[in-house]
UniProtKB/Swiss-Prot annotation:
UniProt record similarity statement: Belongs to the class-I aminoacyl-tRNA synthetase family.
Organism: Ureaplasma parvum serovar 3 (strain ATCC 700970)
Motif ('HIGH' region): 40-51
Entries under PROSITE patterns matching the protein: AA_TRNA_LIGASE_I
SUPFAM superfamilies, per database record: Anticodon-binding domain of a subclass of class I aminoacyl-tRNA synthetases, Nucleotidylyl transferase, ValRS/IleRS/LeuRS editing domain
Motif 'KMSKS' region, residue range(s) on this chain: 580-584
UniProt EC number: 6.1.1.4
UniProt-recorded name of the protein: Leucine--tRNA ligase
Key words of the record: Aminoacyl-tRNA synthetase, ATP-binding, Cytoplasm, Ligase, Nucleotide-binding, Protein biosynthesis
Gene: leuS
Amino acid sequence: MYNHNKIEKKWQKYWLDNKTFKFVDNPNNPKKFYVLDMFPYPSGKGLHVGHPKGYTATDVISRFKRLNGYDVLHPIGWDAFGLPAEQYALETNNHPHTFTQQNIKIFRKQLQMIGFDFDYDKEVDTTDPQFYQWTQWIFVQLYKHNLAEIQDIDVNWCENLGTVLSNEEVVLNDKNERVSERGGHPVVRKPMKQWVLKIVDYADKLLDGLNEVEFSESLKSLQRNWIGKSIGTSVQFKIKDSLLTLDVFTTRIDTIYGVQYLVVAPEHPILKSITSEQQINVVQSYIEQTKKISDLDRIADTNKTGVFSGAYAINPINQEIIPIWVSDYVLMNFATGAVMGVPAHDERDYAFAKKYALPIKSVIDTKQKLPYAGDGLHINSAMINGLNIKQSQNVLNDYLIKNHLGKKVANYKLRNWIFSRQRYWGEPFPVLFDENNQIKIIEDLPVLLPNLNEFKPSKTGESPLANAQEWLYVEIDGKKYRRETNTMPQWAGSSWYFLAYILKNEDGSYTPLNSEEAKKRFAKWLPVDVYIGGQEHAVLHLLYSRFWHRFLYDIGVVPTKEPFYKVINQGMILGENNEKMSKSKGNVINPDDIIASHGADTLRIYEMFMGPLTASLPWNPDGLDAMRKWLDRVYRLYHNLSELEVVEDLNKLNEEIIIAYHTLIKNYTKAINEQAFNIAISEMMVFVNVLYKNKVINYELLDNFLILLSCYAPHLAEELYSLNHSESVCLQKMPIYDEQKIIAQNITIPIQINGKLKHTINVLRDTNAEELVNLALACEQVKQEIGDQPIKKQIVVVNKIINFVI
C-alpha cells in the first residue's frame, strides 16, 4: 500500500509552487473549453462528500481537454454575500466579513487537498468591492433600460429573518404553512416598497433560448413550467348597473357562451367598488381568511371555497347577466385576477358550480359525461355553432378585437423578481433619493458597504444600513440625498460571476465589463461549454443568470444569447441507507476523513465510479475500499517492472495488449466526452488486468496509461510518471489510438457442415474465400465429417463463417 498522505501533499505543493494549472489564453489557439462548477457558499461547515462529486467531474473534463490541446478555463470562487452568512454572524456574534474570509480559507484548503486543477489567481469573491462594482453596474444598466423599478407590492415578509423573500425562497412545511426556505421561519404577505427586476419582460426570450442549449429535457421542463406561458384572450365584461368593466382572462374563449359566473381573486381591487352592502362583511371576512393561505394551497386540487360578491356582470357576447363570485383559487398575480366560470367544460368550474348550486350549460356537442374539456363542434353558441375549438377561437377573437371588447394576450406564471432585501450583508444599491423621493443613480462605482458592528434586522422592515448615519446621507452640488438602505439579494453576484472569471487578471484586478478588451475575451470564451451543479439551482439561479446574460447580450456587452451551452445536474451522494445526508441523521461524511484514511485519489475515483453523474446513489464503504485496492494494484505494477518482460517497440507487443491499449484510449475518450466517467474507469481497470495477465510491458505504453490516469488520480499519476520524467504528467498530450489496431488480425472462423458447427480455424483477417475453403478442407476433422460425400454447395462469408452443404 502506497503512502497517499506523503505523495498527495508532495504533489499539491508542487502544483501550487510551479503554478502547474495557471490559466493559459493563447491567442493563436482556436481550441478553448470553459468548464464551470456552480460556485459554493463558504459556510462554516466546510465541504461534505457530496461537493467533490461535481467538482471532480469538472476536474476530469478540464484535465482531459488540456491533454487534448485546448486552452482551458476551470475556475473557482465564492458566493459569499447573503442571508446564510448574516444569520450565522448574528448567531455567533461575529462580523460576516471576518468569518466569511475564514471560511473561504478552509474551503480553499479542502479543495487543494482533493487536487483540483483550479488556478487560484482566477478566484472570485462576490463580497470583493472590485467584483460587486460590476454587479452594481449591471443593476444601473437594468435601471436605465426600464427593467428595474420600485413598486408597491405585496411581498413575502419573514419577521424572524427580518427581510422580504422572493416567491422562490418560500416553501411549504409539513403543516402546509408558508415558511422560508432557509431556516423554516414563518412567512406572511405584507405590502412594501421594493426594487423589482422585470424578468417577465424577458419571458419569451428565456423560453426561446432553451432551444439553443443542451440541457436535459427535465431541466428544460422545469424552466418552461416555472415561466408558465399561456396564450389566451382578455375579455371585457361590463359590471351591471355600473360604468366599470372587468378584464377576464381565458385560454378557452370558445366556451364564452357557456359562462355561468365570473370569479375574481380576493385581492382584486374592483371588489371595493362592486361588492353589495349585503355582502361586504362576508367578502371582507373571506379576504382576511385568504391571507393565511399560501398561493400553492390556493391553486391545489382541493375543495374550492368562495363567496358571492353581490354584483353581476354582462356577457359581451350574448348579453346574459351572470353573478360575480370571489374565490381563493384565483390569484391576483396571474393574468387579470379574474376568470370565467364554465362548469360544463372545466373540472374546477364544475366542482365549484355543483358546490354552490350554480347553473351548468353545455356549449360543445358531446356524448361524454360532463365536464368535457376536449374538442368538438359547438352548440348553443350562436355565431360559432358547428365550429371546432380552433375555428371558434379565431371567429370570437376577431369579433372581440373588432368591437374593442377584448384582445389576444400571453400570460406567465413567472413573477417579476423582488430584488431588494432588508439585510446588511449584500451589495449596496447605487441609488440616492432626494427630499422628494426622486431617484438619482450613482455612476461612480463601487458604492462600498459600510462596516457596521450592529446589523441586526429590524422587525419593521427597515434595513440595518439605516443605522450607518455617516454613510447614509450624501451632499451633491449643495443638495442632500439619502442612500437606498436595502441591499441586493444573494442571487445578484451569482447571476454574472461566470463572466467575472474571464475578466479576472493575474494581479487581482478586473478588466472592465464594458470594455473592448472584455468583448475580445468574451468572444473567445463564451458560452460556458459545460456547467455542473445541483438540481436545486435548476430554476432560480439558472433562470436569473440567463436573464442577466440575455440582457447583457441585448445591450452589446456579451456576444452570446445564452451563458451556458450544456448544464448537467449531478445527483446527490446519499447516506448508506439511501437517505439524504444530514447532521440530524448522523450520516454526514467529511471528505477530510476519507482523504486521511484512503487518499484524495481514492475519493475522486470512487465518486466518479459510483455510477452515472446524474444519479443519486448511496455511499458504500466497500466500494471505497475497492477503489483503493485498485490504485494500490496500479502502484505495484509500476514498482515491480523488473518482474515483467520489457518490449522496446510498442508496436511489437503481443496482439492482445495492442488491441487493449488502443481500445482503452478510444473508449476512454468517448466516455469522458459523453460524461460517462465511470465507464472510463472501467476501461482502465480492464487494461490493467491485461497487463498483469501478459507480464509484458512497454515504457511508452506505461507513460500513456498514466496520462489517462492523471485525469482521475492525478497525485498517483504524477508520482509514478516522475519515476522516469521530470515534467508534470498533467501537461502531456493525450495519446492517440489507431482504429485499425483495435481490430484483431488473427481471427477464428467457425466451420459448419449442413449448418452445424463442426470445427474452427485461426486465420489472418481478410483471408479470401478460396483460401478459407482450402484451409477448411485441409482439417482432418472436416475431412472425416465429409468423407466421400459430394459437396453440393459451399457458403463462405469472409471473416465470418464457412458452411458446407453435403
